[in-house]
Amino acid sequence: MKRSLNENSARSTAGCLPVPLFNQKKRNRQPLTSNPLKDDPGISTPSDNYDFPPLPTDWAWEAMNAELAPVMKTVDTGQIPHSVPRPLRSQDSIFNSIQSNTERSQGGWSYSDNNKNTSLKTWNKNDFKPQCKRTNLVANDGKNSCPMSSGAQQQKQFGIPEPPNLPRNKETELLRQTHSSKISGSTMRGLDKNSALQTFKPNFQQNQYKKQMLDDIPEDNTLKETSLFQLQFKEKANSLRIISAVIESMKYWREHAQKTVLLFEVLAVLDSAVTPGPYYSKTFLMRDGKNTLPCVFFEIDRELPRLIRGRVHRCVGNYDQKKNIFKCVSVRPASVSEQKSFQAFVKIADVEMRYYINVMNET
């Protein structure tokens, strides 16, 4: 601590002469005494200057005891001193000053029971809207069912009137002071645990409210979309179909459904050699009993595989009634299983084609 003293001023402190702590020849600094006067106007307060050397233990203890008295008085009267030396305050004095600040700002917000401060602060619905459950609105006849804090329950139990509404900025400052006092370590022991739970309750309620809002979203649109999606699968698919038919039935269905593009599947025996034609085409003749069918295959994207005369082949394509030619898109030898199941496929295709032609004639 720096002292501003005159060089010619001589002071007597309890019969002891002032002892300079620094050598004035080497440094031009003001001397410090081991036991200074408290009422000296030249001594600056610790709140102004904080550059001070280590002090003797007996002097610091006397100064601290002298300062604890006005601090305790301010705690009892509810007033805060204007200038209190900060570096010499212990943890107990810091806790008492924080408690006095809280009592002064709250006014009638707390009561003392056996020297225990019980917090009665409740959330004001105008300033801090608590997150209420929407599902209980119908059960409570339109009344919001909000969770009651422990402070509010104690207030209702002891019959204490509700505290006045404070402005929002004062409440936020009060919350910050209480939160900082809780983090301070040893000063945390005197506070109630319920107040700590009340401090973190709004964030938890807000998360619960967001989760409930997501659950309460109406699902009418999603249900409609899923129902339409399922109906589309339940309906019969109108995709491209290959009609299994013999040569005679193929010519018949092509004649009665001229406006419709039909893709036929024919199983017949190769009855001629494969001859090349114009535009990379290959022509051959297929026979089914007494009926014959000239076929053509264009080698545009792939070549025609090797065909053996006298064997059953599977040909897929479109029948041109005017030219009496079957334009193949796929030709390959038929397997044994395909030959056995082909008659059943022909019967199913006949039923479908009769139904389709009847519907087309009615329209």
Swiss-Prot record:
Quaternary structure, per UniProt, is: Component of a multiprotein complex with MEIOB and RPA2. Interacts with MEIOB. Interacts with the complex BRME1:HSF2BP:BRCA2.
- Compositional bias (Polar residues): 1-12, 145-157
Q: What does this protein do?
A: Meiosis-specific protein required for homologous recombination in meiosis I.
Q: In which tissues is it expressed?
A: Expressed in testis.
Protein's UniProt name: Spermatogenesis-associated protein 22
A GO term (biological process) for this protein?
Answer: gamete generation
Q: Which PANTHER family match?
A: SPERMATOGENESIS-ASSOCIATED PROTEIN 22
